[in-house]
């Protein structure tokens, strides 16, 4: 999907007085916060990005010189508010795009999934303003239609952007996501420490987040029970491999096992599930989910991917079964269809080979 008519305004004109450091240029990992924030929008194909600067404008402009971002200065940043900087950015983009994301520069970890779903919702409906939330708490970015932009630019500034939003009687939509980044910023040193911690772990969702993801996608209790059983068997396989000095990432295995059927009920559920999870930032988990139905080969040294595949083939419903039992019903049902039967037996033989490699069975 192309997003040529969508823009982003990143407000970076403040003094960061509560932080006691300059937030936009503080590093998290290998990039500054403002660079990571910008990258979120570039990663989905948004090219019209404006950063509104004020304090230390020269430093921000130098840092962003190679980022394909337009910078505009709020020369009165010492005497004005964040809303004034926002309006400077909105005026710059108002005539060239149909929607505008607005965000502070210290909101670096919003998921691609969140951004794309917000755009999809505004494209398919007549909402003027869409705001995301996580666990009932509103956050950023906020997506504005061109109509909302015009209304906001007429606002007198009372209570800032929230004051303008409050005036919108119809056309406001709040969307809930399983995306902690929505409500994370760096107003204080403690907030910043939490961002640093989150960055270290954000590629693999916690068990708590996995459960929330299952609930978000309305996974049935039956599928959940199966997934938990697969997760349990996956851990047993990991322990078996550890005895042979093959040390795998247990949290990656657990998350992938719990989420492997997140799209169960959809056509090509392994592809759909991996697509969702990839957009949520869980790339490694997505690869395992994609391959849990069918493996291309068995590597010399087994990985997390093979563990989840085998565990899934050892569980029927929520019960541990033999691989023969796991496939017998489908083999019988498709016994007159050589193509499908061949595919089933290929998966079965792969599972048997893996079982022999792990347990010697």
Range-by-range predicted roles:
Residues 242-334:
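Divalent metal-dependent catalytic cores for phosphoryl transfer on phosphate-bearing substrates
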